[in-house]
Amino acid sequence: MLDQLTLCLLLNFLCANVLANTSVFNPCVSQNELSEYEAHQVMENWPVPPIDRAYKCFLTCVLLDLGLIDERGNVQIDKYMKSGVVDWQWVAIELVTCRIEFSDERDLCELSYGIFNCFKDVKLAAEKYVSISNAK
């Protein structure tokens, strides 16, 4: 199993950067900041695709407000782990796999939505696998 330092180094090496807060585009300029409770409610009720671009940008702003991503689209692994959304046992490989899937994406809204939607799908698949394994 990877330790936290190895995971951080691996993720930093594999993760590309995307500029969110440029003079050309900032997806959160017109968004009101949500309370922490409201932001967590949005995360718990993650929408099912297809999602329009405006909602992807809204979700990006929620992720930024919660500190789960930075303005370049990098996942803040420590905050993500503390959020309780993911389990350390499988997170390293899945985070890298999802990040690689969107490595060419330069649009912050598409990038952050894509990565976190991938995380959600992987987490649901893992939970389903565990429930099936426990039922046997």
Swiss-Prot record:
Keywords: Disulfide bond, Olfaction, Sensory transduction, Signal, Transport
Signal sequence interval, chain numbering: 1-20
Intrachain S-S bonds: C28-C61, C57-C109, C98-C118
GO CC annotation, single: extracellular space
Pfam families associated with the record: PBP_GOBP (PF01395)
Family annotation (CDD domains): PBP_GOBP
Keyword Transit peptide: no
InterPro entries: PBP/GOBP, PBP_GOBP_sf
GO MF, one annotated term: odorant binding
Single GO biological process annotation from the record: sensory perception of smell
Function per UniProt: Present in the aqueous fluid surrounding olfactory sensory dendrites and are thought to aid in the capture and transport of hydrophobic odorants into and through this fluid.
Family to which this protein belongs: Belongs to the PBP/GOBP family.
PANTHER family from the UniProt entry: GENERAL ODORANT-BINDING PROTEIN 57C-RELATED, ODORANT BINDING PROTEIN-RELATED
Name used for this protein in its record: General odorant-binding protein 57e
